[in-house]
Amino acid sequence: TYIFWELVGVSSFLLIGFYYSKPSAVAASKKAFIVTRFADLGFLIGLLLLSYYAKGLDFAHINSQETIEQLNGIKVPFIGMSLLPLAAILIFMGAAGKSAMFPLHIWLPDAMEGPTPVSALIHAATMVVAGVYLVARLFPVFAVAKDAVAVVLTVGTFTALFAAIIAITQFDIKRVLAYSTLSQLGYMMLALGVASWEHPLGYTASMFHLTTHACFKALLFLGAGSVIHAVHTNDMREMGGLHSRLPITHITFLIACLAIAGVPPFAGFFSKDEILAAAYYSGHHLPFAVALLVAGLTAFYMFRLYFMTFWNEPKDLKKHEHAHESPFSMVFALVVLAIPSILAGFIPFGHYVYKGELEHHGINWLIASSSIFVGLCGICLAYLMYFRPNDLPSRFAYAFGFFYNIVYHKFYIDEIYLFITHNIIFKYISAPFNWFDRHCVDGFMDLTAQATLQAGRWLRSTVTGHLQTYFVWVIAGMILLCLIIWRLNEVIIWGLAIIGLSGILAAYIYQFVCALLKKTEPLKRIDRD
């Protein structure tokens, strides 16, 4: 799992940096790679802990009751919790990086630098949902590890609300969808956070929403790509009035917006309703309220995007006049994805999870009506503000000027990370380590090299080519060896010494005799210079 987990990260790095000639694309790919690698460090440590104490990494083995009880019984004294929640939190760290949970979300909006089909691939069905799927695969572990599931619930709830608020103020069509993805991933994590053995509906709801979200989010990204192909800009402030120019894109995009807004009978209604029901029935009333609020915000910012793009008045007449529907190869994919965006909610998803034991036999109309009501409120508010030209958006921005500016700049999270990196990590951590590396580590290595070089030069000076000198060195070596033998007094060393000395003496006697008989030339001084 870990190997292919890392290969997913490498693939996203290559896809995001597809336009390698663009500095922004290169920076975005490196940012995604570094952030996810940092998160994967926790994942790796968690895997090592499980491998050492559980004696295996097979999902069936780790999720078994015997293994869970064994890990839960091992205490970690310096942390104050058992090994099971510690390993689960570390694994969730990797999942949070891959699924862009706060505060490791900063790479995902910049991933928009890749081609739009790549964005659809990454944001809809592959990379970003891998973290959610990993937590779901380890549901038995998290269900027992209460500290870990509390972390999952807190992070998921905050991310869902945090990203939805930011999406309200963005004008780049792909960035709105990126923050929408963040919010929906938080929704899925929230569902897993409220799940337990007593109330397992959240587990099913999370996987159900993961499936439906893959359909309508891929449709949204490909629809955005069709719009960008027509008007050659990502800025929604330069769009408007495209419903007549892009009829197929318009209809399919509207279907996707209705699905993600949770309007019945589209797919998103059923999966969102399941998440709300899971939070409500499990007794997590604050996450339920936040999820309900996020449902309204989602409907608002998605129809804000829809009305600014396809209705209102054209902002750039030249671009509007030249806009045309995308070719068949592009709109065909939109039509295909529109079908599951409508019908995927009717799939009896419980049959694929626990053989029907998690099914419910009816709809809680209080929860369903609440979800529909907040969704319609969001749509109506977006209609009033963006369907026709008016000054409501500017008045809203002026009324909430300070807060609006903070939200528009994404709460300055990137700037905070940049400040921490440059002014704290580089200055107070990297600089001292750099000095230690250059002056201590490199200094020790340079000193060793110089000492070795000087020793070599000294030994080279002893090679004179005169047999008398060699004979003196042999005698000195014999005396030194005898002293060592005298101190150690070992039979084996005596034997080795006698054999070695005999060989040395035989060699020098042979060389001496050869020199006397002039059968060989005297040894010449070796000049290695």
Give the label of every model feature segment.
Residues F38-D40, T154, V335, A368-L376, ...:
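Hydrophobic H-region at the start of alpha-helical membrane spans
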Residues C215, C257, C377-C380, C440, ...:
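Generic recognition of cysteine residues
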Residues A323-L381:
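Hard-cation-handling environments
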Residues V128, G156, A256-C257, S329-F346, ...:
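Hydrophobic membrane-spanning alpha-helices of multi-pass integral membrane proteins
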Residues K217-L219, G296-L305, V374-R395, L505-Q511:
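Hydrophobic alpha-helical membrane-embedded segments
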Residues G350-L366, L384-D529:
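Aromatic-capped, Gly/Pro-kinked transmembrane alpha-helices
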Residues E6:
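Short phosphate-coordinating micro-motif centered on Lys-Gly-acidic
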Residues T1, V10-E325, P340, F346:
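Hydrophobic transmembrane alpha-helices and their helix-loop junctions in integral membrane proteins
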